[in-house]
């Protein structure tokens, strides 16, 4: 979702909404406390669960971190699966298995992207404990939850929160006065705070999203035609995508911003000229079958972890190994 400007500064609109934010915060704290104390039931989990989520509403780089974490788990000898809500899809309560050939209208865009990139079982559904159970029945011994930090009904063994280095915690206020889903104090109880971007304090667990060469959405090996392009973004933080295009030297004739998880139609991409159209990988998974597919490209990104993040995740997985009695 797009972030209102007043969420990034503590101005009059934010202060005017502070009473509503206080009510929202009280509800969040109460609900989490009820689950923690066992007054609301949380089903047992048959396998360890690692949640990768955020406090800040909107895009922070969470999905690339999930993909990287899955790779790390496999290197440690685990057989991971991914579970997600499937925002923008029709999975409902689920659980529904997602494969590389799934319809994004059913699975949602991010789960489909992860299914294609990670080659591990992916399940979606609003009932997170049920998706974890489905992953276990599929033969997995650890689950990574893409988002779900606030899904308190789902038991978890570790929590990783992702922050954007530029926006951090915005004006540090809760919804609707600010961008935060939970109080700032929640960060003290998570295992790792991973920061996406530059200009971060020394010691932060930082990572960078490194853009690569454009790839054709239809899967062909056509070379990038060059020249200026139409830049299309339907993600939570589109400015990061536009900055990545500039970083790799792709000129932008016009920007086209759509809502997060937007379901694209051919009309959305019907532009007056024949310039190439470049988009995010998350958008590309929904556009492969559109008539304009031969003009569509996406910009892949690879996560480059800093030393602190690599060490923190290594320590987390070592502790998880010991807890599960693995050698």
From Swiss-Prot:
HAMAP family: LpxK. It comes from Halorhodospira halophila (strain DSM 244 / SL1) (Ectothiorhodospira halophila (strain DSM 244 / SL1)). It holds the Pfam family LpxK. Its EC number is 2.7.1.130. Belongs to the LpxK family. NCBIfam families: lpxK. This is Tetraacyldisaccharide 4'-kinase. It catalyses: a lipid A disaccharide + ATP = a lipid IVA + ADP + H(+). Keywords: ATP-binding, Kinase, Lipid A biosynthesis, Lipid biosynthesis, Lipid metabolism, Nucleotide-binding, Transferase. InterPro entries: LpxK, P-loop_NTPase.
